[in-house]
Amino acid sequence: MLAKRIIPCLDVRDGQVVKGVQFRNHEIIGDIVPLAKRYAEEGADELVFYDITASSDGRVVDKSWVTRVAEVIDIPFCVAGGIKTLEDAAQILSFGADKISVNSPALADPTLITRLADRFGVQCIVVGIDTWFDEETGKYHVNQYTGDESRTRVTQWETLDWVREVQQRGAGEIVLNMMNQDGVRNGYDLVQLKKVREACRVPLIASGGAGTMEHFLDAFREANVDGALAASVFHKQIINIGELKAFLAQQGVEIRVC
């Protein structure tokens, strides 16, 4: 059995790490490189960086900090933000990223997933899915351009349909960003995760809602996700990564303990 992964997420805007609640009202957390180094030293299995306004601004991720991150950490990291071409992806990978993630650009042009997978291999192509539960309809829908709340829009895709679509097109991993739970710290949406897990044959990463160590445990035990991503509990030092991994190991979760 592959070890489960603990993945801090760093949302980047204007060269700094920020964090919002339900993808809104972002506050500045700190500088990118020191935070990345801290998480690597605490025992994170990998890091994910989202340049959250790149797609809505019509630009690609600022590549200058990618090189600096690669110089100070020795764990894998994934970069996302406005990657629309093979050239964009190649440059980010050449600067030291291990994976690239696409989200809004893939919704605009789903063939991008296949072209990236064919060129670089499925192992380094991640698809991020920003999913919102509509209480009126009882359905989960995929949202686009979520880094800028003034430009966010609901797409035609229901979440499970898009999960199936991106796998067919070559996604090597899926990060499910559950917007209703984002930053609230009341736990992951286990109901949604279980549904997506049934439809997902590639590694699945849960994102949105972690507030306690037990929330991570629930995601691994009940939804059988491959990794759990979180931001605010790590940024605000509510949970220490090393202590979290020790707790999970004590509970019988297969996890890499430093």
Swiss-Prot record:
One of the record's GO molecular function terms: imidazoleglycerol-phosphate synthase activity
InterPro entries named among the record's database cross-references: Aldolase_TIM, His_biosynth, HisF, IGPS_HisA/HisF, RibuloseP-bd_barrel
Function: IGPS catalyzes the conversion of PRFAR and glutamine to IGP, AICAR and glutamate. The HisF subunit catalyzes the cyclization activity that produces IGP and AICAR from PRFAR using the ammonia provided by the HisH subunit.
Naturally occurring in which organism (per UniProt): Cronobacter sakazakii (strain ATCC BAA-894)
Enzyme Commission identifier(s): 4.3.2.10
Protein name: Imidazole glycerol phosphate synthase subunit HisF
Subunit structure: Heterodimer of HisH and HisF.
Pathways involved: Amino-acid biosynthesis; L-histidine biosynthesis; L-histidine from 5-phospho-alpha-D-ribose 1-diphosphate: step 5/9
Signal sequence coordinates: none
